[in-house]
Amino acid sequence: MERFEDTVVGGLSGIDRDPRTGTWYFVSDDRRRYNPARFYTGELDIDRVTGAFTGVRVTGVATLTRRDGTPYPGYGNPEAADPESIRFDRWSGRLLWGDEGDRPDTANPDIPISRAAIRGMDLNGRHTGEMRTPPNLRLTTTENGPRRNFGFEGLAVTARSVTAVTEGPRYEDGPVPTAERGAVTRLTVWNRGGEVRGQYAYPLDRLPAAPNPPSGHTDSGVSEILAIDEFRYLALERAWIQGVGYRVRLYEIDLRGATNVLDRDALPRSGSYRPVTKRLVQDLGEFRPPVQNLESLAWGPRLRGGECTLVIGSDDNFDQREMTLMMAFAVTGCR
């Protein structure tokens, strides 16, 4: 495994870029297995003229701290952090990060509650505040609210809003996706003052294949979102299927016309509400196989021809069988 300043570099679950300085930020979802919760700074070598992407360098590391200035405790402890996304907020000059939190379930009954939250920090990792989590997205010890590992996973920032998506369905919103049917998760929008402005249903795809054996494990949902403008976002839907591997699709979603479901206790798939619309942009399985655990989306530098650079990154899960992969694409129609 790669190391930097006595830390293990891995588990990179979110990336973003400061467009003013060109500095990149990479958050690790290490839950103190190796080191405390942290983010790295770095550089991506992308030629604005040719579009060639030739390398990645880590240049710094900072520990995420709590209100009292101490690092977050490790896995299995109250207040343990599970960082899943990071955004540079160019309108405030600070960083935002998504903490998926943790909770007990039938397989892990002794895990204590760690709150899911969208938090702010300065460029040194010091806590600066957090958004108010809607009551329907608070983690519990019962079969209510988000399931374990289905808390805040994707995060996006615009001039007027902060948006986060939970990876998969709440208990009340129905079962998780299977090869026969999809599911519904929730996308929440806050105003810049931290008040919830709305919540919208996001229709998740069914699994692209059945597990092998049929009773095998699966894990699927939204792994990241990225703002195009105030209403449109890119969304990564990622599935891991036992006996099949990873499958990832990139969608464009649009909130316009969607029903605000903030006050709805449950979202049946055929309910009387309108979800966000989604359009397939690319099946990422058509690129470099085998498909990795793609969890990151960020805008890179604008190219000389006017296209935006879209960077998609993977989380290696600190597993020698997987890799940290960064892919860059030239895209049109961006902000």
Segments from the language model and where they lie:
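Sequence/structural signature of beta-propeller domains
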Residues: 1-335
